Amino acid sequence: VRDTEYRIGASANGQLAITLTNSFLTSLTAGSYTLTVSYDPLGETYVSGGDNQAPASTTVVLTVGRSTVDADIASMDKIYDSEPVTPSANTESDGVMTWEFKPDGADPGAYTTAAPEDAGTYNVRLTVAETEHYDRIEKTGTFTITPKEIRLHTPALEDKTYDGSTAIVCMYYYPERAMEGKISGDDLSVVMGQANADSPDVGRRTVTFTGFALAGSDAANYNLTAQPNSGSAAITARPLSIGSLTVRDKLYDGLN
């Protein structure tokens, strides 16, 4: 111990006290240390030899334990973006961090170091390794990746001839442009629903849609917020043909 790492003074009961500085104590790693205090009478340095009597000394065992600190896991809640979550935490420990994840409700054995990217609720487990100064830390938490909202453009509608029904043919000429909000590269497509006019009668009719849905391996990562906006289509009159007429002779009766 260097001279600058301790102070000598009187204790509360009037006895001599040796106080180690905080800078010295914090420099020690966890473990046991033996401190020997030697006393030089009258401030004279002891010189061995002759009839000189060695000064008294005191031995003290100093035990330094590891500090117990916490770790705060930052929120990982987000809307689906096709990218794995990026975990982070605040802690005083300088130990190596290990992150593990599993679906919420799954057994502890399901933990894996692969960071999730798909929509769902997950459990996270952070382990901070023990160091010379700090105890091992283990923290858990929960976060949710929310499905991304997506909407469908209004499909093209075909006019038709009156047939007594409200059904209208609809289609997307460019299926890749049918959706707004899809992330490039995701496997996502539209399941076509039904289009129906507000009346089966002839005229320009308002058409609404039902039954449209999403398909593909990434469909669970999206939330279809509504059916396509309404459109319009024309129902035209159905041509009616009259067959041949038969004319019969008759006696005069004054009528046409």
Q: How should each PLM-predicted stretch be described?
A:
Residues 1-256:
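Short loop/turn motifs that initiate or flank beta-strands
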